[in-house]
Curated annotation (Swiss-Prot):
Any GO MF annotation of the entry: sodium:proton antiporter activity
Catalytic reactions of this protein: Na(+)(in) + 2 H(+)(out) = Na(+)(out) + 2 H(+)(in)
GO biological process, one term: regulation of pH
HAMAP family from the UniProt entry: NhaA
Transmembrane domains' residue ranges: 28-48, 79-99, 115-135, 143-163, 173-193, 196-216, 219-239, 240-260, 317-337, 356-376, 392-412, 426-446
Keywords linked to the UniProt accession: Antiport, Cell inner membrane, Cell membrane, Ion transport, Membrane, Sodium, Sodium transport, Transmembrane, Transmembrane helix, Transport
Bilayer topology: Multi-pass membrane protein
InterPro entries: Na/H_antiporter_dom_sf (IPR023171), NhaA (IPR004670)
Entry protein name: Na(+)/H(+) antiporter NhaA
Length: 468
């Protein structure tokens, strides 16, 4: 049988440039330091915009109504609601999936491994809450006790990434585990303390959405698009209950499978067979143009999708949207505090600002370091390999970068008091910026010490190798 091989064609130069640019952009979007910088830039723009001559346009934009109509039914809410209560659900979905992965195979997969980050996280919640309450023990200021207890994963890890590879990998893993536990605690705080009176009829709607998700998983539906509608039902149900609807993201994230679904033919086998069929088809075809068979192409797409666990696949798809669209948009919509509009003398608002900032700068690092030291001192835990006390200090400082999550909790705590909300946001911005700068400064010292210790070990080993 005669085999026909079509001659390779040179790709157009424009296509080559486009492919290289896309590959560069894709690598760029997965650099954690870049996402932190984008988040910081969005917050800075919001702050400048809200205090400029165009401040009216800033507030008018976020209060502009956005509605959805279906027949005679209309659901209208300001743009601010759609960002904070709808888009942020995707952020919490990513958080839920990160928690699910860590419980399955990461730093939270066994208690012995998770004990020290868990204790550090608890210390990093209790200490700042107590420091805040020391400044603000009376209502309504006391409602903000949870504001400085949170850690912004993206911002904290982004700052750590700026320090480069001199920082041991286990420091990053410890910080991630601590921040994830912090997020779990923050979600529980939102659910129990900031959800208001609950209308239990909404739980039936949320339960229906969860049942549909379980049913789709049971029959082996792998495409993420099939879960959009039941996810929306869960979100609507939680909104009806009075609980914060973004918790739907956490629920769905924790339900996302961490292993590939079972198939009659394994993805690699399907991919190999479909590739052989396509190769045979191309060899059998003359140079004349004709469409490739659709079945092997469809099987290749399915195999490519199913070779990864759903939690990894969805997380990878969500990451650029969450890091470069949703979180910066949240910062842009919420970090714009009008300095003229905040009267720090009214109602003790200056104590709210001081309490939040002081709790993030002092309480968060102190709680993380003290609890870690206590458990190691008692012999209940050991520091992870490669992590020294200098690394724990760095983790404690970066845990004080509350930013996104702290602003989110502040908006729930002071929903009815714009002045105290503004003061709390100022405290979050000042505290987060201060701990980030302190973390960078200490991280540079810590990295230099590690390099010096490594060089000393290398010098000490050199004479030994010469004598051997």
């Amino acid at each position: 049988m005669t085999r026909h091989h079509s001659a390779p064609r040179n790709l157009p130069r424009a296509q080559l440039y486009a492919e290289r640019a896309f590959a560069t952009l894709e690598r760029f979007l997965h650099v954690e330091a870049v996402s932190g910088a984008v988040l910081l830039a969005a917050a800075a723009i919001a702050l400048v915009w809200a205090n400029s001559a165009f401040a009216h346009s800033y507030h008018a934009l976020w209060h502009a109504p956005l509605s959805f109509r279906l027949g005679s039914y209309e659901f209208a809410q300001p743009l601010h609601f759609w960002i904070n209560d709808a888009l942020m659900t995707l952020f919490f979905l990513a958080v839920g999936m990160e928690i699910r992965r860590e419980i399955h195979e990461g730093a939270l997969s066994n208690f012995r491994q998770a004990a020290l980050p868990l204790a550090a996280a608890l210390g990093g919640v209790v200490a700042p809450a107590l420091i805040y309450l020391a400044f603000n023990g009376q209502a309504p200021r006391s409602a903000g006790w949870a504001v400085p207890t949170a850690t912004d994963i993206a911002f904290a890890v982004g700052v750590l990434a700026l320090l480069g590879r001199a920082i041991p990998g286990n420091v990053r893993i410890f910080l991630l585990a601590l921040a994830i536990i912090d997020d779990i605690i923050a979600v529980l705080i939102i659910a129990f303390f900031y959800s208001g009176g609950l209308d239990y009829s909404g739980f039936a709607v949320a339960a229906l959405g969860i049942a549909i998700v379980l049913g789709l998983q049971r029959i082996g539906i792998g495409t993420a698009y099939a879960y959009v509608l039941p996810g929306a039902i869960v979100w609507t149900g939680l909104l009806m209950t009075g609980a914060h609807p973004t918790l739907a993201g956490v629920v769905l994230g924790l339900m996302t499978p961490v292993v590939p679904r079972r198939m009659r033919e394994q993805p690699l086998e399907m991919m190999s067979r479909a590739t052989r069929e396509l190769a045979g088809w191309y060899q059998a075809q003359p140079a004349a143009e004709s469409g490739a068979p659709t079945l092997p192409l469809r099987q290749l797409r399915v195999a490519q999708r199913e070779i990864l666990p759903p939690v990894v696949r969805v997380q990878a798809a969500l990451h650029p949207w969450v890091a470069y669209a949703i979180m910066p948009l949240f910062a842009l919509a919420n970090a714009g505090v009008s300095l003229d509009g905040v009267d720090l003398a009214a109602g003790g608002s200056h104590w709210v600002m001081a309490g939040v900032a002081g709790a993030l700068i002092v309480g968060k690092p102190a709680g993380v370091i003290a609890m870690s030291w206590l458990l190691v001192r008692l012999g209940w835990c050991r520091l992870p390999p490669g992590v020294t006390w200098g690394g724990i200090v760095l983790i404690g400082l970066l845990a004080g970068v509350g930013f996104t999550m702290s602003i989110f909790i502040a908006m729930l705590a002071f929903a009815g008091d714009a002045n105290m909300l503004g003061a709390a946001k100022l405290g979050v911005l000042l505290g987060s910026l201060a701990t980030a700068m302190l973390g960078l400064a200490w991280g540079a010292i810590y990295a230099r010490r590690l390099r010096g210790a490594s060089a000393t070990r290398g010098t000490a080993q050199a004479p030994d190798s010469a004598h051997s």
